[in-house]
């Protein structure tokens, strides 16, 4: 799967991103419905108003997420770009060329917009992604991920270039941190506690 994405040209990747943007807007009602489940659970569990605001998605915020994807399409494709080069004394020229990492794992907390941000950034750079969001945004994250998986398939990519960890337990998260055989890079996005846990277990 990662090889298919790694060799995909800019046009195909941008077409998939455009499909994701369109699908997010088209399915905004579905996303909001899933998000309402997360908000109801958050209120029940006594989540602070400020944290609930981070968690909340409405039509305008979904439009903002889709707009960010549209902006990503406009950016230059970094893959294949030559950063610099040098000529060795024997005449051999050595250059640094940007290539995809492979499979990137993302562990993040309660902001559901990160699900779309992470997946689309990975797609633009030719990387497959495994997403593990916070349990507070489980329904929102899962819904957004399913929409994106369908969108990339419609654009001609395998669904599995975007994967979602369905289990939000700490044990599974810790296991993901240790998957160095399958992950080429692990990125934590969150508070000090998350960063510390990743540093300890990765």
Language-model segments: which ranges?
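Rossmann-like NAD(P) dinucleotide-binding subdomain of oxidoreductase/dehydrogenase enzymes
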Residues: 74, 83-202
């Amino acid at each position: 799967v990662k090889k298919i994405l790694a060799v995909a040209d800019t046009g195909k990747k941008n077409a998939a991103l455009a499909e994701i943007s369109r699908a997010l807007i088209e399915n905004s009602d579905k996303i909001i419905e899933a998000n309402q489940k997360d908000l109801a659970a958050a209120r029940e569990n006594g989540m602070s108003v400020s944290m609930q605001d981070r968690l909340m998605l409405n039509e305008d915020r979904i439009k903002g997420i889709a707009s960010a994807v549209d902006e990503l399409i406009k950016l230059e494709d970094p893959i294949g770009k030559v950063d610099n080069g040098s000529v060795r004394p024997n005449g051999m020229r050595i250059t640094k060329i940007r290539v995809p990492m492979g499979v990137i794992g993302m562990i993040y907390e309660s902001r559901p917009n990160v699900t779309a941000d992470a997946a689309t950034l990975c797609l633009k750079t030719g990387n497959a992604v495994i997403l593990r969001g916070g349990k507070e945004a489980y329904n929102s994250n899962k819904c957004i991920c399913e929409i994106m998986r369908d969108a990339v398939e419609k654009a001609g990519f395998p669904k599995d270039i975007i994967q979602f960890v369905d289990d939000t337990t700490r044990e599974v998260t810790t296991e993901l941190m240790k998957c160095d055989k399958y992950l080429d890079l692990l990125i934590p996005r969150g508070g000090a506690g998350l960063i510390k846990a990743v540093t300890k277990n990765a």
